[in-house]
Every structure is written in structure tokens, then in C-alpha cells.
């Protein structure tokens, strides 16, 4: 079986290692020839996973022509690159039988769509699955225990993809609810930023836990509005991923929120950070107008948007959010 992964960052490489440990040969696509040479010759990916040796059966390429004939193609690019990646696959003549996986987190930046809908725009006949879970890429690469949720509408796809990943160290669950998992993947980075700010501003762990709980409510509300009839928050990829992202200070979005919480305005920190690397910044910009349009009380989204995109004072935005949540629960 030929399996390709597009995106040789930390998470894409970690996914490749999970498959390689189950003796599947994996082709890892990266745009940079030097990166390809490092993976193929040294079996390392030092920029993203230092001190990790990659299995020899992982091979890298910088040519789309090398992967379009693969039976399974998993996309692990930043969310704002998914549409271009799908278009590229179509232009290179990908088979209608190829199974497309999405492991990217976030929403489409051009049309504010779920990433699964972007795939349908160009590859409507291809089977599709979403893969996510509460995993830090470095721990997965080390071979530590982890859990994954495989979401697909077709039962056969769910079963087959789950079987590829399952091992004594990898717990897999399956669901047909592809909507809630994608919504949670977008929301969780925003919630993590606010959680990081909460701790930096010394509101305490109680407040942080309350914000995470509110975040779950907002995920459910948005998922229903997006078409999920019965949002399943119990999956590893929903509540599990949210807990990990919000509580692990090594998580990129939580760390960003904590650093941001040392200041009063985003502009005080923005010169020292690359917003393209913080998915929560991009997600807040996309989700804010959608939640307003859908008339949803997503107070965490409104707070994050105010801070990150509307010049809001951080402490004032947090206080406003807490008051609105408090008022709503009465």
C-alpha cells in the first residue's frame, strides 16, 4: 500500500512515524529539496523533531508527481495551504479512488469553510477522512502512548484507516461526525490562547477550567450550526485535544497566550512573533464573522478577536468575556 503525507513538519513527520512503525512505507512530501535530502540521507528532521531518528522506510520527495499515484494521501499543511494543496493534487491527476486524509487544524481561509468541504470542491468523488487527537508531535515521534480519532462518513474508510494506525501504543477511535472534529480543531487553538492569557494574568486554574468548559459549549453550538446533528465531544479529537492544547505550556498556542498575557495589547508582542505559526490567530479572524452571522454567543471567540484583530486591551477583553459568560449562566 502506498501512503503519502503532504507536510513534513513535526505533526506530519510524527504521523509518518506511526505508520512506519506498523511497517507501512510512507512518502513524505516537502517543498524544499534540502529538507528532502536530510530525511533521505540522514533520516532526521532536525528543524521540527530534533534528536529523533526516522525509520528508513520513510522516504521524502519534493515532487507531487511522486505521490499522486498513492492510495492514501494525508494532508498535514497549515490550514491556509490546504486549498492550494488540493488543487495541486487535482491538477496532477490524482485518482478518484485515492483516499484523502486531513490532519491540518483550522478552517479554509478563502471561503471560511470546513477543510472537508474544500476537498469536496475539487475532489468530490474521493473518499475522505479526518484524523486528529490529543497529541504532542514530539511525544508521538518518541513512541510514547497516544490516541487518535478517525472520522469518516463511510464506515469502511473509518475501519481501514483506524487499522493502519492501531498498535499497542496507539489507541484509535472512530466516528462519522466529521463536522465536530473539524470545528474543535479550529476552536481549540483560540481557547488555548485565552487559557494562556488567563494563567499569565493570574486568574487562576479554576478560571482556566471554567473557560475550557465554556469552550466546549461553544464548540457544540457551532458544530450544530454547521450541520452536526449530535455533536460528539467525548472523542479524543475533541475534549482530549482541547485539554492537552490548553494545559500543555509547550503547546504553541497556549505558550503564545501566556506570553501575550504579559502585556496589555497584542501589538506589544506582535513584533516578536510570527502570526502564521499560531493557528489560533488565523482561526479567530475566520470564526468571528461566522459566529456573528450565525447569531451564536461564542464569547471566547469574541474576546480573542477583540484582542488579536481589533486592538482591544487584553485585561478589558478578558473581564468583558467573564461578565458575559456569568450573565448568560444566570
Swiss-Prot record:
Compartments (UniProt record): Cytoplasm
Family: Belongs to the NAD-dependent glycerol-3-phosphate dehydrogenase family.
UniProt keyword Nucleotide-binding present: yes
Secretion signal, residue range per the UniProt entry: none
Enzyme nomenclature, EC number: 1.1.1.94
Keywords: Cytoplasm, Lipid biosynthesis, Lipid metabolism, NAD, NADP, Nucleotide-binding, Oxidoreductase, Phospholipid biosynthesis, Phospholipid metabolism
One BP term from GO: glycerol-3-phosphate catabolic process
Reaction(s) the record says it catalyses: sn-glycerol 3-phosphate + NAD(+) = dihydroxyacetone phosphate + NADH + H(+); sn-glycerol 3-phosphate + NADP(+) = dihydroxyacetone phosphate + NADPH + H(+)
PROSITE patterns on file: NAD_G3PDH
Pfam families: NAD_Gly3P_dh_C, NAD_Gly3P_dh_N
Residues the entry annotates as binding sn-glycerol 3-phosphate: 105, 133, 188, 241, 251-253
Physiological role: Catalyzes the reduction of the glycolytic intermediate dihydroxyacetone phosphate (DHAP) to sn-glycerol 3-phosphate (G3P), the key precursor for phospholipid synthesis.
Annotated active site: 188
Name recorded for this polypeptide: Glycerol-3-phosphate dehydrogenase [NAD(P)+]
Keyword NADP: yes
Native species: Orientia tsutsugamushi (strain Ikeda) (Rickettsia tsutsugamushi)
Main location: cytoplasm
Pathway assigned in UniProt: Membrane lipid metabolism; glycerophospholipid metabolism
A molecular-function term among this protein's GO annotations: glycerol-3-phosphate dehydrogenase [NAD(P)+] activity
GO CC annotation terms, alphabetical: cytosol
Residues binding NADPH, per UniProt: 11, 31-32, 105, 137, 252, 277, 279
Amino acid at each position: 500500500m502506498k501512503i503519502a503525507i503532504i507536510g513534513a513538519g513535526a505533526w506530519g513527520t510524527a504521523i509518518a512515524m506511526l505508520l512506519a512503525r506498523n511497517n507501512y512505507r510512507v512518502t513524505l512530501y516537502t517543498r524544499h529539496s534540502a529538507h528532502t535530502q536530510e530525511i533521505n540521507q540522514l533520516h532526521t528532521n532536525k528543524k521540527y523533531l530534533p534528536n529523533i531518528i526516522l525509520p528508513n522506510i520513510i522516504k521524502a520527495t519534493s515532487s507531487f508527481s511522486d505521490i499522486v499515484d498513492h492510495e492514501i494521501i494525508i494532508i498535514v499543511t497549515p490550514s491556509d495551504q490546504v486549498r492550494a494543496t488540493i488543487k495541486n493534487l487535482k491538477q496532477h491527476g490524482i485518482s478518484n479512488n485515492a483516499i484523502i486524509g486531513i490532519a491540518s487544524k483550522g478552517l479554509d481561509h478563502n471561503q471560511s469553510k470546513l477543510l472537508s468541504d474544500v476537498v469536496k470542491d475539487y475532489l468530490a468523488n474521493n473518499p475522505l477522512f479526518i484524523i486528529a487527537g490529543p497529541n504532542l508531535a514530539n511525544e508521538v515521534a518518541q513512541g510514547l502512548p497516544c490516541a487518535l480519532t478517525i472520522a469518516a462518513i463511510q464506515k469502511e474508510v473509518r475501519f481501514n484507516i483506524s487499522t493502519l494506525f492501531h498498535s499497542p501504543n496507539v489507541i484509535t477511535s472512530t466516528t462519522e461526525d466529521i463536522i465536530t472534529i473539524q470545528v474543535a480543531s479550529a476552536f481549540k487553538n483560540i481557547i488555548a490562547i485565552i487559557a494562556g492569557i488567563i494563567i499569565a494574568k493570574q486568574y487562576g486554574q479554576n478560571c482556566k477550567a471554567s473557560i475550557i468548559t465554556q469552550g466546549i459549549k461553544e464548540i457544540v453550538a457551532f458544530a450544530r450550526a454547521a450541520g452536526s446533528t449530535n455533536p460528539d465531544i467525548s472523542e479524543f479529537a475533541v475534549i482530549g485535544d482541547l485539554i492537552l492544547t490548553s494545559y500543555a505550556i509547550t503547546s504553541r498556542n497556549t505558550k503564545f497566550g501566556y506570553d501575550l498575557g504579559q502585556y496589555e495589547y497584542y501589538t506589544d508582542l506582535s513584533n516578536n512573533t510570527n502570526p502564521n505559526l499560531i493557528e489560533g490567530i488565523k482561526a479567530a479572524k475566520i470564526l468571528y464573522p461566522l459566529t456573528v452571522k450565525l447569531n451564536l454567543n461564542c464569547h471566547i471567540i469574541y474576546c480573542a478577536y477583540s484582542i488579536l484583530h481589533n486592538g482591544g486591551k487584553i485585561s478589558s477583553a478578558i473581564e468583558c468575556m467573564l461578565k458575559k459568560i456569568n450573565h448568560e449562566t444566570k
